[in-house]
Amino acid sequence: MTLFQPLKGKSAESVETIEALRVLPEQVGEEVESLSEEQLRFRPGAGQWCIKEVIGHLRDFAEIDHDRLVRMISMESPLLPGYDQEALVRARNYQEADLRAVLAALASFREQTVHVLTELVDANWARQGRHEEVGRFSIRQFVERLVRHEAMHLEHVRALKRQATGF
């Protein structure tokens, strides 16, 4: 059974989904490149994330979901454990982190995921995993969920930017 092939021959849907993932780190970087440290740390309310923490969460999600994807490809219906995103953001102290390093890590994990998806045979997008909180889903459903999640957080970054800058 062939698991991988080049992007050539991919369905339009797969290519579009992969492209949406590929461009996210650049889009996030462009949104925040002109912001001051004070603006990057702006919190709209108590207990809410600042821009740096949202980007840190995206970095964490990219790392964890890359691992989940590899497990779904290499194992039969693996269990994919959840994680406490709030605790991880606090533990990694993204508010104090070097944003360039966080963005670079996000881009690196995303590049790895895009490479794997680019090479994955379309038929294998049906392979499944079992998330302990969400339940069973295919690689296609998993990646589509990832795209929606990242689009939501890109809008979150834009909203925080508007609040922090007044524009």
Can you annotate each of these PLM segments?
Residues 1-23:
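Extreme N-terminal tail/first-helix region
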Residues 18, 55, 59, 103:
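Short gly/ser-rich anion-binding loops that grip negatively charged ligand groups
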Residues 2-7, 41-85, 111-114, 128-167:
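Short, contiguous alpha-helical
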Residues 36, 73, 118-121, 161:
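A structural signal for long alpha-helical coiled-coils and helix-turn connectors
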Residues 11-13, 51, 88-102, 133-141:
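Acidic/His metal-coordination segments adjacent to aromatic residues that form catalytic metal sites
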Residues 34-35, 40-41:
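Cytochrome P450 catalytic-domain "roof"
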Residues 19-33, 89-126, 146:
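Acidic/histidine-rich alpha-helical segments that form the ligand environment
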